[in-house]
Regions:
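Non-heme di-metal
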Residues: 1-208
């Protein structure tokens, strides 16, 4: 079902450490709109999708988010692996260093640890897919913010641009999945029932 290729989706080769920028990018590792939450969200939601197409989209994107997680963690690692103690102290990286040295650990740019309350798996395909559309836009916005900071550093900006572009593609794929779910609904009111749980004909046809 799945094949792991031992290479990054996009090459990363950062030669100059930068502790301050690493803290910004770290947010896409374990922040509120980061890749850990995205992968867990989609891989959890896939089980209650009402058709194979929507389930496959969630599975494909959820596993790709794991590849993006690998990319973001590689960027953070390369930005911090050769830091001197002077750089750590001057950059404000000290509190992170005390707890994790230069290990990669999931937290937001502000230092808030990752937690699963930052994503949902509601069991309602329409609800979940709308959440996913919003999640991809929030991730794109975060990458936009990062790009404003690193725009003049090509070795960082180039892989970030790649990640941003994939968020746009994911948004489009989730739109396709949402349409496939809505087209299967009998009611023009998409919120009349949960197609993964309720039976819309239960009251009238007694066949469910």
């Amino acid at each position: 079902m799945w094949n792991y290729e031992k290479r990054l989706q996009y090459p990363i080769n950062i030669k100059t450490p930068n502790a301050k920028i690493s803290q910004f990018i770290m947010s896409q590792y374990g922040g509120p709109d980061g890749e850990i939450g995205a992968s867990l969200r989609y891989l959890s939601q896939r089980f209650t999708m009402p058709n194979r197409m929507a389930s496959a989209v969630l599975n494909d994107i959820g596993t790709e988010e794991l590849a993006h997680l690998e990319m973001v963690s590689t960027i953070v690692h390369q930005l911090t692996r050769d830091l001197s103690m002077e750089e750590i102290e001057k950059s404000g990286f000290g509190p992170y260093y005390i707890d994790h040295t230069v290990g990669v650990w999931p937290q937001a740019a502000g230092g808030v640890p990752f937690n699963a309350c930052e994503f949902q798996s509601k069991g309602d395909p329409v609800t979940d897919l709308f959440e996913n559309l919003a999640a991809e836009q929030k991730a794109r916005s975060t990458y936009d913010n990062i790009l404003r900071v690193v725009r003049n550093i090509p070795e960082i900006a180039d892989p970030i641009r790649f990640l941003r572009a994939r968020e746009v593609v994911h948004f489009q794929r989730f739109g396709e999945a949402l349409r496939s779910v809505q087209e299967q609904l009998d009611s023009k009111n998409f919120y009349a029932f949960n197609p993964s749980f309720d039976c819309p004909c239960e009251a009238s046809c007694k066949k469910c």
